[in-house]
Amino acid sequence: MKGLHWEGTLNSRNHETGLDVPPGRVLAVVGPNGAGKSTLLDLLCGLLKPDRGRLDIDGQVLVDSRRFVPAHRRRIGLLGQQPLLFPHLDVLGNVAYGPRAQKLRRDKAKALALEMLERVDAAGLASRRPGELSGGQAARVALARALATKPRAMLIDEPFAAVDVEYTPRLRVAVKAALAEVGCPCVIVTHDPADVAALADDIAVLESGRIVEHGPVAEVIAYPESSFGTLLFDRDQPEQSP
């Protein structure tokens, strides 16, 4: 079966949590502090090993009771709160690093890196060093680097935390377009309802390690059933992107 599928526990309370994200869909995970959002991302990308759980992507089992595929072999792209770029490499070298690690020839890796930079409207930054980038520019480069590895799934954690507020809408547009082109399943953790409306197709509300509400963006925003969903969306929200 195509897509990302997870079922397991996030904490010692042994609440079962299940996610099913088809290819090309973006699932926003929201919830109060301590709900387990970061733990969920760490489990999916391989930074944590679950006490009990199963993860498969495109039919390949990555985690179950008998196996645990390490993070570097999962081909899952991760875009975190703070873009982590190698300071000794220029932007093109940073984006080409992943493909080179996957044994792609140097010339092909650079061509792919430039293609990914163009996709996020950052080709003009290719020769710059990370220290010369603004928060928004660094976020674009980090997104290009994640996409250059041809990920089977994308995980995004508060991607605009280090971005100036006035630049955030433009970056949301770039992220949305890039994810649509790649077409892989994506899980985004955010506290900002504007991120949900602009980027996501579906929402999962996480509380105390379990999903208490799940559904299409428009439905959950209009008729939230959980206490946190009601609190988060009980205000005028921007329209969801078509």
Regions found by a protein language model. Name each.
Residues H214-G215:
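ABC ATPase "signature
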Residues D64, D107-L125, K176-A177:
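Conserved ABC ATPase "signature" region
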Residues C45:
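Helix-to-loop junction immediately C-terminal to a conserved catalytic motif
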Residues S208-G209:
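Conserved ABC ATPase "signature" C-loop
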Residues R129-L133, Q137:
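Conserved ABC ATPase signature
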Residues A148-R152:
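A short, proline-enriched helix->beta-strand linker immediately N-terminal to the Walker B motif
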Residues L62-G77, A101, R106, V220-P224:
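ABC ATPase NBD coupling module
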